[in-house]
């Protein structure tokens, strides 16, 4: 073969041009090959580098194919790899027998990958041609150059390059096999070099010395050492490593030389005595190279590294590869020949520039450049282009979209959670983390009785060995109506599934999700993925009462399925169980769905609510759980297992590019996620550090992350000795290795959330993820609190040296420019699965420079599904604004409109500043308008009518902000203007764009075209916002725009008619000779007072809205007459008098133009015709004749409206939108159809367009019109940001089925049989009776006609507690007398039926007396028991007696309430009440009259209960039965409707009793007849309570009562509450008593029993809630031990034989106390002599309480209410005060 002659002639077009030399080296970069491969991997995900990605994919496939063909021993050396780039992550492979193959592959991949990527970035620089381009390289670099030589374009390079990579791998295998036969690999794994470089030695001398040695030692030919490379300053010798070492020991010539081992460990090349052309062919030939032959030939010459000449012409790719491979295997490298060849060709080409392209500088490159610079003529520029830095350059901040979904990063855009210990949102969860709290506690009673189900000894069957866990407070709380669930369905639905849908909603809300707003939020492309590993509630709670919803409410699949169904998501819903790693494995599955393109947005998370004691027992016996009181002692030396935990969390994920396009807040970005299994562990539950390490490396590889860039690892950290030790081994090995340690500036922190909130099992992974997201947000690492003693001894001892840190206190974790925070999250399964994900901080998204929202007014909306929630949402928004005073109003408007789902109860505020917004929101709340707002119709959006304004209200010139700011509106205007100019009319844009002042008049053509075209554009703008008309009407000139919107006229034809008509007017009519005049009078009135004068009726707009036309003189005359009669007349600013005789000259020609030049279509909307006073539906009515008549004849707007209403084209619900410059037509609509409810303008004269539009949009929104808010904000979205506003305010109630008894312990065994009697005594008798207030019968006994029954109930049980909190006083739930009544009705009926079976009693609950309030304690986690007994000596006496007791620490306290039940006949009651009926009715009528006269006060429901709450009692909604109240002094009646809302099990629901009876309390605490600021009144009971018929839900009643002070005590009031239905007395609460107390005592009487009332702030005149009940016997609590206690009564000082007390200093506490006593008792100081007894001074028990409270409040002296009994005289008190407070 002849050499290829690439030398151009002197005439060649390449002469005097530049020359390019591309050099591929033979050494891998020594400074971070892994980092380079990671960067290349990252570039392959970038859409800008498809060729690079294809090259890597093709190369990976090629190497996979070659590995498959290896023999078994070699194949076993290669671990699985996903990408050829990942081979760099296997250092053991690079040191093994195949090191030559791996290094060759990586070298070619890096160099060719860099070459391709560089030129994809700069495609214009890819200018190579065969005449002036030369390729060369050393060793394998020469092989890489063949790919470039064969590729005519850059697009061809990936396929040719992949073949180079394949051949490089084969070459390494061949060399390894051949070299192994020359010297086997060292058994110890030590690597020896096969080549040494020796500087300053002549090649000939070296060769002669080697020949001598070989001859002397009879070295076999194949084992001889040889010269493999020659350079100007050195030679390289190669051979078997052992012989090389021997050479340097034995040869004097070589021993005395400097020699350097080269990193050549794979074997020999450049050895012609070993290899031949057959070896070269064996490496090259194969099916893949043959495929290249069909399309590739050598394009650019490659210079031989032996001769320096181009390789011979190759007609196929195979031939070129064989040339190169033969050279690599058999020829020594002589770089000087290459240099000489390049220099000679540069001279022959007479180039002006030589560019040398390299991949980093090197000695050969340096020598080449030096030779070029010294050898070429002066003026020839020699340049080097280093392509290597392209890989490591700083990338653009603006991230390009990924190559495909598989290369996307995953953005987390929303999150929500319910965590233990009151963490009902992420902020409260962060508080727990930040404060370093451990929130474990004893298993609460709403799960199961921990005392009976816990056995620390582990001997009791099915019992737990631990009593501890971490629990969500009140997991049964749920807003069932919001999620369209009935109370029964809610109660039977697993609470974790309920909380999952709640947190899903909140996460989506925080993510700004609105269905179908963008491509990624399309409901068809969204799915749900949740982890769940238990079914406690189904197995235990709802299994006790299996019914309709047992399966859909309890089975796992329904959790995510219900979320999909509620949100109408069409994508997949997965419930995944991988035990403890369920939620993170689920999130990985969700990421995979996003990467695969299966979905565009997912809601994912995990859930766990613990109610089944079996799981505690099973995990205890499996040695999983700690027995000690802690969350998890993660990394502690005494870690003994984990603490179980509740938790529910949801996150919203989408691909990063979608999140950025959607303008989302990005909380964090998932870079990679994977799951594997600890298959090699010693048991299925035992962790395996190797598997964990492998998983971490896999995630890092796929994400292209350097482990040293990870600064935080959230570890699984369950707190077991084995688990903690294995995990720290894997984490330290990967992220803080002992070798290649982290720099001191680059620590990695570790943490574990389980130390705070326990192990949530199925929710553990997402809990950890939420923690990391919060850390990103808060820029802090919270303290780790798991190490209670000392660190686990199994941890590496060199953590500090490795720079691996445990944060024992909160650490800053700030953003840093140019370096993202990256964290890893581990979540492992007891079943052996491991899941890990890598996550980095979300990108900062500042508003772009210059991006502004120019709108002057904004609309803020708030909505809810209930009025209670609406109020809560308003309050939350106000709180947010208070906390964020600098919030941008535009962002707030955008968030609340375009990024929120809108419910049926709506509030909208149009405003220009935050202060005004807050004022309007406060006004809405304070005025109670929330309760009067009407929700939007459930039947769908209202019909919409567009009314197009005529010319009478138009400006002369406009300055439309909408034209300036709205691209859509502007484009419509400009398009219409183009149409107008195309028809020869002048541009009308100057008339609307602010070019002229408003009083500048334009010619009629411009004026009329401007009006009609603006209205057309405005109507289309409304339609673009989703406000689409169902019917149109146009007034006069406005009818042309209306006909276009209805489809009758094209825009071009409408412009033609308007423009031509205006031209005719200018030509045929005299401007201003005639006038149009609006008159505020009816037709009859005008006829009556001006009928004698000439005028024409131009418009009949309403009953009293007329427009007259005529000459100027005629109009002036008419105006004088009408104004004289008091009618308002306004001359319209129009040039012509339309609809009058002035139009006659143009009519014929105008009709002809319309007939010949215009196409009239059938309307696609009903058109209300003011000309015809009818609605047009057909295609024949509107034609050229119609247009003529409409110009000349009267506009009958009034009759047109009435006709349209009559035939139901419009109705009262129709929403009217005025399309025009000022609201005119909508006023006509209102006057014509007064029942019309909603009318809005588009523009208003003198008002900024945005002010008008936002106000109108708010009205439409509240009317139920579905506005496209996204479209409204879209032009300004670059300047807008989504705010993280408070989430929805739920109207929650408790839905919970309580696990009863101990059957989980006893099932299937006899272990507890012997304990049965004892258990029965403790747990109560089996009984069919169980209500919300009578929960457990603990004793019952019957003997003939005598009987007794005793029950115990826990006030902390959800329904009972809710009932108490339904009646709040002083901020606390109080057991109201109505609850006591329900208990009495229940036990009374039960006892009666036991003694008189099959009989139905009518009961009178009589003589109820409550001597001490029963107040709900603050600690809801421990029981608060009461015991009530009912007994009768003889049921035939028809009475039973009841007593109430508190049960404290198992002991029964003195009774605090009592009552008697009389069994009577309802007929007797009705008969006794009948005579009083007319008296009661008479008083009611009298009160009604007083109210009408303004003497009595009438209150709405909201007002009444608002006053009640501000005075004393805050009732829950169910208790608020009074719909209205009429009150005069101490007498009132109320109309009552009982709620239909269900909840709880009752005999007579307390909220029914209270609703019909608490009118008496309302009088006593609201009436201005009492001093309610200073006092409050509570009831200790009544004489009788009787209901002749059951109180029924939804029924209407009327209550009446008059309260009268008693003669004996003016602080006690009595009254009879009559309950009427249909004017018949059906019930009565007789002798109801109220006692008045000073308000200062409210806090003392109504504080939680487990709180020190005297340390809390005294109640003001507007107390918070608490239970009523006290009488004069109410007792204060004893003083705490820390206060100065009074001596025992036996030692109390007395006045007998005791000296007078020393006189205190005037400023002393004692003196102030005595002065206070005098003030409060109304005494003089002189009355308070030391010998005076307090009883003689009139200080009774009530006054004692008041003074005691004043002591505490004013002086800080804490005493009991019995102070004046213990110190009965003034002297006694002085002495005690001086002793303790002087």
Swiss-Prot record:
Malonyl-CoA:ACP transacylase (MAT) domain: region residues: 946-1266
Pfam families: Acyl_transf_1 (PF00698), CurL-like_PKS_C (PF22621), ketoacyl-synt (PF00109), Ketoacyl-synt_C (PF02801), PP-binding (PF00550), SAT (PF16073)
Domain named PKS/mFAS DH: residues: 1335-1643
SMART domains per the UniProt record, alphabetical: PKS_AT (SM00827), PKS_KS (SM00825), PKS_PP (SM00823)
Stretch list, region C-terminal hotdog fold: 1495-1643
Keywords from the named record: Multifunctional enzyme, Phosphopantetheine, Phosphoprotein, Transferase
Carrier domain sequence ranges: 1704-1781
Recorded metabolic or biological pathway in which this protein acts: Secondary metabolite biosynthesis
Chain positions covered by the region annotation Disordered: 1653-1703
Source taxon at top rank: Eukaryota
InterPro entries (alphabetical): Ac_transferase_dom_sf (IPR001227), ACP-like_sf (IPR036736), Acyl_transferase_dom (IPR014043), Acyl_Trfase/lysoPLipase (IPR016035), Ketoacyl_synth_AS (IPR018201), Ketoacyl_synth_C (IPR014031), Ketoacyl_synth_N (IPR014030), Malonyl_transacylase_ACP-bd (IPR016036)
Modified residues (O-(pantetheine 4'-phosphoryl)serine): 1741
All residue ranges annotated as the Ketosynthase family 3 (KS3) domain in the record: 407-841
Region of interest (N-terminal hotdog fold), ranges: 1335-1468
Alphabetized PROSITE patterns for the sequence: CARRIER, KS3_1, KS3_2, PKS_MFAS_DH
Tissues where this protein is expressed: Specifically expressed in conidia.
Annotated catalysed reactions: holo-[ACP] + 8 malonyl-CoA + 8 H(+) = atrochrysone carboxyl-[ACP] + 8 CO2 + 8 CoA + 2 H2O
Catalytic machinery residues: 580, 716, 759, 1367, 1554
Sequence ranges of Low complexity compositional bias: 1678-1695
GO molecular function, one term: fatty acid synthase activity
Annotated domain remarks: Multidomain protein; including a starter unit:ACP transacylase (SAT) that selects the starter unit; a ketosynthase (KS) that catalyzes repeated decarboxylative condensation to elongate the polyketide backbone; a malonyl-CoA:ACP transacylase (MAT) that selects and transfers the extender unit malonyl-CoA; a product template (PT) domain that controls the immediate cyclization regioselectivity of the reactive polyketide backbone; and an acyl-carrier protein (ACP) that serves as the tether of the growing and completed polyketide via its phosphopantetheinyl arm.
UniProt-listed NCBIfam families: PT_fungal_PKS
The protein's name in its UniProt record: Atrochrysone carboxylic acid synthase
Annotated organism of origin: Aspergillus fumigatus (strain ATCC MYA-4609 / CBS 101355 / FGSC A1100 / Af293) (Neosartorya fumigata)
Lineage of origin: Eukaryota, Fungi, Dikarya, Ascomycota, Pezizomycotina
